């Protein structure tokens, strides 16, 4: 049966990203948020929110939900009312559309006919419906009706690592497979007015943005037709951190997606991440974490700071994660693929020898509900100038 499997590891062959056109500047967001939610009388809470925004290290975010949408659905600005139907009516349509935009860019870079796509993986924590966002995205793209689809809802911020893990397994076990994997989240699912008793909500309003990212994954790239690997996906792993239950979560309620984020999350991740690294890199003989490149989900500034401090990383190791956080905020599952895209583009622009900032080996990390950590050992490819 080995003739049915590919030889060699799967590779990322193309990357595409997309964001809504509507841009919100972080410095202006506290005034905007309290104005549109008719909460300007909550002056002390607004000042707390302003401090959260100031510390976020976010410059701007792309947000689908604009004032016109809020005028059409005025209950969305209230804190705790039944708005799930209105949110889902929007997101069931918009999530596949934004995902399609990212897919189209990845397919264009790949340069092959979309009829060669054999599998589609889609993940989103923004909406749930039947048939799912995978079905609607496939229809929008005009993919073959026999494309093999996988839909994963409610993974959250580690979902970017998950789609790579599953895409790798599919590509390596099905000779000739070309897997289109897409992550898309639109935070209209959790936009609500403020409350003095819900400070976690304010953190979510301050850091989350909207985005979609897609990758084409396949083994044995066919260079005769122009396929070129960007990164090899060498190994994958997933773990639930000890004593972390309840620290990150999301709950679908009549008022939308209710978000949980415990203050201990940065400490929990930083205290446990080296164990994940040792398990991943001991077989390769690597123990110097400054000798690898990093594709890290920037869940927030504090997570990056704590990991950098704990592992004694050089300040440039998270430059791509910090850039994506600054320009887009936390876009949930797609964010880490934005970081991967930023890394390979910056490596080319700066004349580096490989797609991984000049390093051969690297790691991709996603952190999310559970607290779940998804990791992928990644190998860069030489850049030909």
UniProtKB/Swiss-Prot annotation:
<dbReference type="GO" id="GO:0005737">
    <property type="term" value="C:cytoplasm"/>
</dbReference>
<protein>
    <recommendedName>
        <fullName>Polyketide synthase 1</fullName>
        <ecNumber>2.3.1.-</ecNumber>
    </recommendedName>
</protein>
<dbReference type="GO" id="GO:0016747">
    <property type="term" value="F:acyltransferase activity, transferring groups other than amino-acyl groups"/>
</dbReference>
<keyword id="KW-0963">Cytoplasm</keyword>
<dbReference type="InterPro" id="IPR018088">
    <property type="entry name" value="Chalcone/stilbene_synthase_AS"/>
</dbReference>
<dbReference type="GO" id="GO:0030639">
    <property type="term" value="P:polyketide biosynthetic process"/>
</dbReference>
<keyword id="KW-0012">Acyltransferase</keyword>
<dbReference type="Pfam" id="PF02797">
    <property type="entry name" value="Chal_sti_synt_C"/>
</dbReference>
<dbReference type="InterPro" id="IPR011141">
    <property type="entry name" value="Polyketide_synthase_type-III"/>
</dbReference>
<dbReference type="Pfam" id="PF00195">
    <property type="entry name" value="Chal_sti_synt_N"/>
</dbReference>
<dbReference type="InterPro" id="IPR001099">
    <property type="entry name" value="Chalcone/stilbene_synt_N"/>
</dbReference>
<dbReference type="InterPro" id="IPR012328">
    <property type="entry name" value="Chalcone/stilbene_synt_C"/>
</dbReference>
<feature type="active site">
    <location>
        <position position="157"/>
    </location>
</feature>
<keyword id="KW-0808">Transferase</keyword>
<comment type="similarity">
    <text>Belongs to the thiolase-like superfamily. Chalcone/stilbene synthases family.</text>
</comment>
<dbReference type="InterPro" id="IPR016039">
    <property type="entry name" value="Thiolase-like"/>
</dbReference>
<comment type="function">
    <text>Polyketide synthase responsible for the biosynthesis of secondary metabolites.</text>
</comment>
